[in-house]
Every structure is written in structure tokens, then in C-alpha cells.
Amino acid sequence: MSMLCYTLIIAFLIGIWAAPKSEDNVPLGSPATSDLSDTSCAQTHEGLKTSRNTDQRHPAPKKAEDQELASAANIIVDPKLFQKRRFQSPRVLFSTQPPPLSRDEQSVEFLDNEDTLNRNIRAKRETHPVHNRGEYSVCDSISVWVANKTKAMDIKGKPVTVMVDVNLNNHVYKQYFFETKYRNPNPVPSGCRGIDSGHWNSYCTTTQTYVRALTMEGNQASWRFIRIDAACVCVISRKTENF
């Protein structure tokens, strides 16, 4: 009986010794482990290549400001917006080319060809002839047509987006604003020209007004009153006498 038990135990040990070792029990540095490492590195490299290709096919989204400007350029303005001329200002002009240096005092205009532009300049010269009388203003001002105004403050004090280009009846017009401001941004110590500095304090400054301009609200164009530079004035105050 004891011999039979010894024989079974020996046969069992021989079977365990002869059984092949699994890959999970292979020691570090063996050929099986090297194959697994190579396979893992290859899969990681392929994953990185796939990620780079995906990024190239799907670029990063554009900024919100760029999208807003692009959408504003594609907005088609309804011609009905220009039928009511009640609040239109002579300081706002829609034109396909740069306007003349002097503004017309009539109303909002559309200049779409050179003949119209030349007629406007001739009419302005005939209406306001130049006189050399040595006339001087109390403040030196400068007036320009502003072509690329994109931001402004509305009548409620909120920032709004101003439309630069207006697509109307398949024609692209640019919105111009005639602005007047003080030529020197820094106040002059001597004050305004022609003011008695012995009795008055004076300085030149720029004042603003509201004009009706075409602005962008969401994906639609709408009229709003915005604030622009309108004039250069002299501010004076009486000097207090010290006794």
C-alpha cells in the first residue's frame, strides 16, 4: 500500500515538472516579455499617429470674434431698412468708395459711382466758397471720415457692434462716419484762442453726439443710435479773485 502511494506521488511530481510554463510566469527579460514590450510600443506609436491625423482633419475652432466678423460680412441687409429717412443723419454715409473730405449737410447718401462723387464735391464748393479773411476758431479741430468703426456705445451706454460693410441688393457698401474732434489730444496750458486768460479759465475739448447707424444684433442688421465725436468746443469758467 505504501509503495502504491509513493508511486502516485512520484508520478504527480514528474507531471508538474514536465508541464510548460505560462507566459504570465515568465521572468523579466525573457523573449516572451520582449515580444510583449515591442507590441505595446508599436500600439502606442500607432495611437499617436492616429491622434495627430485626427487633429489635422479637425482643426481647432476659430475664436468667437473671428466668427462674429465673418458672420457680419455675410449678412444681407433688407432694403426696407432704408425706406424711413426720419432719423438718418448727414454724418452717416454708405458708399462704395471713399467719400469727399467735406461732408454734405443734406442727408444720408449712397455714392456708387465717380460722377455722383464729383457732383457732390462741386456742389459743396459752390455752396461754401472759401474766403481768406483771417478767420480763426477758438479751438483747432479736425474732421475726418471714419471707415472702419466696429465698436461703439449706444444711447443706453452699452457696447454694440457696428457694421462696416453692408450687403444691399448684391452691392457691398461701406458705412462711413463723419467725425470732428480736437486736433491736439492734450489740453494746451494757454487755453482757448482769443480768451482773456486774466479773467477766464479755458480749455478745448471734444463733444459727442448720437447718430443712427446700422449695427449688428445677433444675425440681423438693425438701426441704433451710437455715440461719435461731433465737435470741438471751448469750455470756460470765471477765475475766482483772491482777496
From Swiss-Prot:
Disulfide bonds join 139-204, 192-234. Pfam families: NGF (PF00243). The keyword Signal applies. Residues 1-18 form the signal peptide. Residues 47-67 are annotated as: Disordered. It comes from the Eukaryota. GO terms for molecular function: growth factor activity; lipid binding; metalloendopeptidase inhibitor activity; nerve growth factor receptor binding; toxin activity. Residues 47-66 have a biased composition (Basic and acidic residues). The keyword Disulfide bond applies. Glycans are attached at residue 148. Keywords: Cleavage on pair of basic residues, Disulfide bond, Glycoprotein, Growth factor, Lipid-binding, Metalloenzyme inhibitor, Metalloprotease inhibitor, Protease inhibitor, Secreted, Signal, Toxin. One of its GO terms (cellular component) is axon. SMART domains: NGF. Its main location: secreted. GO terms for biological process: cell surface receptor protein tyrosine kinase signaling pathway; modulation of chemical synaptic transmission; negative regulation of neuron apoptotic process; nerve development; nerve growth factor signaling pathway; neuron projection morphogenesis. SUPFAM superfamilies: Cystine-knot cytokines. Expressed by the venom gland. Residues 19-125 form a propeptide. It is found in: Secreted. Homodimer; non-covalently linked. Belongs to the NGF-beta family. Nerve growth factor is important for the development and maintenance of the sympathetic and sensory nervous systems. It stimulates division and differentiation of sympathetic and embryonic sensory neurons as well as basal forebrain cholinergic neurons in the brain. Its relevance in the snake venom is not clear. However, it has been shown to inhibit metalloproteinase-dependent proteolysis of platelet glycoprotein Ib alpha, suggesting a metalloproteinase inhibition to prevent metalloprotease autodigestion and/or protection against prey proteases. This is Venom nerve growth factor 2. It comes from Pseudonaja textilis.
